[in-house]
């Protein structure tokens, strides 16, 4: 199976949906932040490994604790995934912290600051010319 085949894309979507459901409703580890979401999943073409990109809303300590909690629950998550997703091999899951949402929020704030500064400068120039 090729990496970007229709079958692989469908498997990625199914694993993403089930992984999100397992993390949200079945894991009771207090280290895992309730504001945790699965952003993307990449299942290898041989179905042996899976990269799960996780986004955590919170500070850096909360993010590290969540990843640690998910790694400790990896065996349980894999068993639950095997029960819900019908695959020949249940992939070994690697959790990767995805900070793209935080990066986007930070960039948006910077753009807003520059726009606000530009507007202030524009108003000051207009006041001086009058």
Curated annotation (Swiss-Prot):
Any one annotated GO CC term: cytosol
Source taxon at top rank: Bacteria
InterPro entries: KH_dom-like_a/b (IPR015946), RbfA (IPR000238), RbfA_dom_sf (IPR023799), Ribosome-bd_factorA_CS (IPR020053)
GO MF entry, a single one: ribosomal small subunit binding
PANTHER family: RIBOSOME-BINDING FACTOR A, CHLOROPLASTIC-RELATED
Quaternary structure note: Monomer. Binds 30S ribosomal subunits, but not 50S ribosomal subunits or 70S ribosomes.
Alphabetical list of NCBIfam families matching this protein: rbfA (TIGR00082)
Protein's name in the database: Ribosome-binding factor A
Organism: Lachnospira eligens (strain ATCC 27750 / DSM 3376 / VPI C15-48 / C15-B4)
